[in-house]
């Protein structure tokens, strides 16, 4: 009669650390395997292209406030939740990051709002 997985797991669960160590050594000897972690090699060449495709966090940077600074300040306040003075200082100090570590959809939405207000925006 075959032993069920649940029976094996229950037996292992009741073992001490020393007993588990001896069990691992017995498996290594019996089956000729190693319990050492296997190092996985990274992709060779084309790594930069793969990294660019996998980018999931973006930074929205206010490059320039443009002619309609008041609208840009309002948009910055709406996006960041900053007070009037903080938003004005941020807009006056352009180029500055507005949002950092956001997903692509949020970055594009922020860019759209700021551009509609008259600002020049970059998404990095």
UniProtKB/Swiss-Prot annotation:
One of its GO terms (biological process) is translation. Gene3D superfamilies: 3.30.1390.10, Single helix bin. SUPFAM superfamilies: ClpS-like (SSF54736), Ribosomal protein L7/12, oligomerisation (N-terminal) domain (SSF48300). Keywords: Ribonucleoprotein, Ribosomal protein. CDD domains: Ribosomal_L7_L12. InterPro entries: Ribosomal_bL12 (IPR000206), Ribosomal_bL12_C (IPR013823), Ribosomal_bL12_C/ClpS-like (IPR014719), Ribosomal_bL12_oligo (IPR008932), Ribosomal_bL12_oligo_N_sf (IPR036235). GO terms for molecular function: mRNA binding; structural constituent of ribosome. Coiled coil: none annotated. One of its GO terms (cellular component) is cytosolic large ribosomal subunit. Homodimer. Part of the ribosomal stalk of the 50S ribosomal subunit. Forms a multimeric L10(L12)X complex, where L10 forms an elongated spine to which 2 to 4 L12 dimers bind in a sequential fashion. Binds GTP-bound translation factors. Belongs to the bacterial ribosomal protein bL12 family. Forms part of the ribosomal stalk which helps the ribosome interact with GTP-bound translation factors. Is thus essential for accurate translation. This is Large ribosomal subunit protein bL12. It comes from Burkholderia cenocepacia (strain ATCC BAA-245 / DSM 16553 / LMG 16656 / NCTC 13227 / J2315 / CF5610). The gene is rplL.
């Amino acid at each position: 009669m075959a032993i069920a997985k649940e029976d094996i797991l229950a037996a292992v669960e009741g073992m001490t650390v020393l007993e588990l160590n001896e069990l691992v050594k017995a498996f290594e000897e019996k089956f000729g395997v190693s319990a050492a972690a296997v190092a996985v090699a990274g992709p060779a060449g084309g790594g930069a292209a793969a990294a660019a495709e996998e980018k999931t966090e973006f930074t929205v940077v206010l490059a320039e406030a443009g002619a309609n600074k008041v609208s840009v300040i309002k948009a910055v306040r709406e996006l960041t939740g900053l007070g009037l003075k903080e938003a004005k200082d941020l807009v006056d100090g352009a180029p500055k990051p507005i949002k950092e570590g956001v997903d692509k959809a949020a970055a594009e939405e922020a860019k759209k709002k700021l551009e509609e207000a008259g600002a020049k925006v970059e998404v990095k």
